């Protein structure tokens, strides 16, 4: 724990120094013990980078991005990460966690800092492009592109019933960047969206999504508006 605190303090001091640099000077630092989640710093701008892979191009969706080996059958992207690292990176990027969706006694949408989700692609020619994540998602009822950004709901941390003294971050069960409302979501959309399989609101926009297995980088940028 003491080592982690020292590392966190060192990182915060580095971020403070980097924020004074020109925006053209881009730095990237790994967040967590394993590769997969990064904090990108360009002057005062901080963005979270998540290495991911395309796993679904057709059909209905509950997730935009899930953790590997969880909900790949209902998510466009998967990432082999610990979602706690993504949460920590968002905090370092200046996001404030709010609260997950509440279903009873009355519906309250997820809250928290607004987060813009983009996908960074590298073409066969080596050129890098970024497109809005919501452009890969189509509303089943209207046929139009998803018109909402995400919010940093922050998921939940509970005691592990099988290992006393251990904590569990519930978004690690799959709900990292959600399209259906889940009270375990790290990022959720702040509008009512069913998780009932018969009434899912969103589907993959197949023609816009690259082939299965394509490696991408998901970019999370905290809105300052």
Where are these regions (language model features)?
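Bacterial N-terminal signal peptides that target proteins for export
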Residues: 1-9
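Long, low-hydrophobicity ectodomains and other hydrophilic envelope-associated domains
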Residues: 22-225
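Bacterial N-terminal signal peptides
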Residues: 8-16
């Amino acid at each position: 724990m003491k080592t982690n605190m020292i590392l966190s303090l060192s990182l915060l001091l580095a971020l403070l120094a980097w924020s004074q640099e020109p925006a053209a000077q881009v730095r990237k630092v790994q967040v967590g013990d394993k590769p997969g989640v990064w904090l990108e710093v360009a002057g005062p701008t901080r963005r979270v980078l998540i290495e991911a892979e395309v796993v679904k191009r057709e059909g209905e969706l509950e997730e935009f991005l899930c953790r590997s080996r969880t909900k790949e059958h209902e998510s466009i992207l998967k990432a082999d990460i610990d979602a706690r690292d993504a949460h920590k990176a968002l905090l370092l990027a200046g996001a404030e966690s709010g609260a997950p969706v509440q279903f009873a006694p009355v519906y309250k949408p997820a809250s928290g800092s607004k987060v813009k989700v983009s996908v960074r692609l590298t073409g066969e020619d080596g050129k890098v492009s970024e497109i809005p994540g919501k452009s890969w998602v189509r509303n089943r009822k209207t046929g139009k592109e998803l018109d909402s950004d995400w919010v940093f709901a922050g998921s939940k941390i509970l005691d592990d019933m099988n290992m006393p003294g251990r904590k569990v971050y519930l978004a690690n069960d799959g709900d990292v960047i959600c399209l259906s409302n889940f009270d375990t979501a790290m990022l959720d959309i702040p509008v009512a969206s069913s998780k009932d399989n018969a009434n899912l609101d969103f589907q993959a926009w197949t023609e816009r999504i690259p082939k299965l297995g394509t490696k991408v980088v998901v970019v999370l940028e905290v809105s300052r508006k």
